[in-house]
From Swiss-Prot:
This is Transcriptional repressor NrdR. It comes from Thioalkalivibrio sulfidiphilus (strain HL-EbGR7). GO terms for biological process: negative regulation of DNA-templated transcription. Residues 49-139 form the ATP-cone domain. Its cofactor is Zn(2+).
Length: 172
């Protein structure tokens, strides 16, 4: 691999390890000319299915678009970039696991909502408000109430209530 510092054509690998939940290889390299070190990541090149949009149009799967949508919902929330990367990797594995050449965008949206629900309630609500196109405040409240009701004890430990506590505090 060419050195990004001096442009020399020869580098050597000094360390390799798995990264990204095992679907990436992280390599530390050293240039044989200038001795600078740098990191590279190796991913398998996979043929992702095409996405069928609501209007029937088709487009190639875009990981950056998926990550951007999730990151936007998680803006100013205490969720690490690593957690987002792991969620994106799980969604990609689901896409590949379908074994289909095309996948409906609604299915991807459902997987994103599932991942956000597990990461952060506020991000889930932010995404759902756009994805589900709430008609009114009542529809918004119903999704929040369903979300709070469906939380597992483990998830409840890591989240703050959206509508007050179990005793009805904060509810009118």
């Amino acid at each position: 691999m060419r050195c990004p510092f001096c442009g020399a054509p020869d580098t050597r690998v000094i360390d390799s390890r798995l990264a990204g939940e095992g679907d990436q290889v992280r390599r530390r390299r050293e240039c044989l000319s200038c001795s600078e070190r740098f990191t590279t990541y190796e991913n398998a090149e996979l043929n992702m299915p095409r996405v069928v949009k609501r209007d029937g149009s088709r487009e190639p799967f875009n990981e950056d678009k998926l990550k951007s949508g999730m990151t936007h919902a998680l803006e100013k929330r205490a969720v690490s970039t690593d957690k987002v990367e792991e969620a994106v990797a799980r969604i990609k594995r689901k896409l590949l696991g379908q074994g289909e050449r095309e996948v409906d965008s609604r299915r991807i949206g459902e997987w994103v909502m599932e991942e956000l629900r597990n990461l952060d309630q506020v991000a889930y609500i932010r995404f759902a408000s756009v994805y589900l196109s709430f008609a009114d405040v009542q529809a918004f409240r119903e999704v929040i109430e369903r979300l709070e009701k469906d939380l597992t004890p483990e998830m409840r430990k890591h989240q703050i209530p959206l509508l007050g506590d179990e005793e009805g505090e904060g509810k009118d």
